[in-house]
Amino acid sequence: MAKMYYDSDCNLKLLEGKTVAVIGYGSQGHAHAQNLKDSGVNVIVGLTPSSARRKQVEADGLKAYDTAEAAKMADIIMILVPDEKQAAMYEESIAQNLEAGNILMFAHGFNINFKQIVPPADVDVIMVAPKGPGHTVRSQYKEGRGVPALIAVEKDASGKAKEYALAYASGIGAGRAGILETTFREETETDLFGEQAVLCGGVTELMKAGFETLVAAGYQPEIAYFECIHEMKLIVDLINQGGFGEMRYSISDTAEYGDYVTGKRIITDETRKEMKKVLKEIQDGKFAANWIIENKAAGRANFISMRRNESEHQLETVGAELRKMMSWLKK
């Protein structure tokens, strides 16, 4: 079982007298920066010269600098730009501005685990990864609560890397909920597997296959969408709130019986074998290599083509029309 840490295990005073540069001001960046600021930490924000987020940073009471300048000013650098942009940004703006004793931080292990970023030996390399979207990290903090987070230490040059990870996690509010210790490798491999086999790849293909099966059998696309796609949120919310037991308690006995007798016909031994292959391709770096090549290709043509093809599926058109009926979805 994972070991849990809380605010009582963290020493936020370790961050006193240090400057934290949060690189990026998107979903996670704005939450980290504002939470740290409200925790009394000296925070600056690093952005590209052309970033449109500078005004928002200033409106939030923070100071924005070009990424290279922010990195040079900082003792702790948290990189919160998309994975595919991190390596180039690191080489162009951060690497030459690192000093011995600095702390380099990430919220996902991809670029360290797959050696797209190789920091010098005299800096700490740490992960602090909240297990929730940035707006939740921020809103929970403001309400006096927090979102659980993972911490990991890849390189402990200072001898205090774990303590710094805990301090930072506490500063963004994670210590109020719970902090779990992991490794860069474990976080990276499980995160990628969960996305590909279950949360994104697995779920979308399952919903799409169900929709297509009903439509091919002559059922109305709108009914197929309701039964195979729209109602997914109802089930996931129940599981999120109380696990499979809560979900099964809340659904009809007919649905529960169908769960038991049919689920294993859909997720078969062959499916599990394929899942193991997917995991192996993540572990041995095959997936990462393919994704890195894709991002280096001009225009990311294959990726854009797949995105376009999926956007043209019938379920997208049907769903868009049905969502017009749902007043609670309208902002």
Curated annotation (Swiss-Prot):
It catalyses: (2R)-2,3-dihydroxy-3-methylbutanoate + NADP(+) = (2S)-2-acetolactate + NADPH + H(+); (2R,3R)-2,3-dihydroxy-3-methylpentanoate + NADP(+) = (S)-2-ethyl-2-hydroxy-3-oxobutanoate + NADPH + H(+). Pathway: Amino-acid biosynthesis; L-isoleucine biosynthesis; L-isoleucine from 2-oxobutanoate: step 2/4; Amino-acid biosynthesis; L-valine biosynthesis; L-valine from pyruvate: step 2/4. Keywords: Amino-acid biosynthesis, Branched-chain amino acid biosynthesis, Magnesium, Metal-binding, NADP, Oxidoreductase. Residues 2-182 form the KARI N-terminal Rossmann domain. InterPro entries: 6-PGluconate_DH-like_C_sf (IPR008927), KARI (IPR013023), KARI_C (IPR000506), KARI_N (IPR013116), KARI_prok (IPR014359), NAD(P)-bd_dom_sf (IPR036291). The active site is at residue 108. Mg(2+) 2 binds at residues 191, 227, 231. Substrate binds at residue 252. The keyword Magnesium applies. Residues 183-329 form the KARI C-terminal knotted domain. Belongs to the ketol-acid reductoisomerase family. The keyword Oxidoreductase applies. This is Ketol-acid reductoisomerase (NADP(+)).
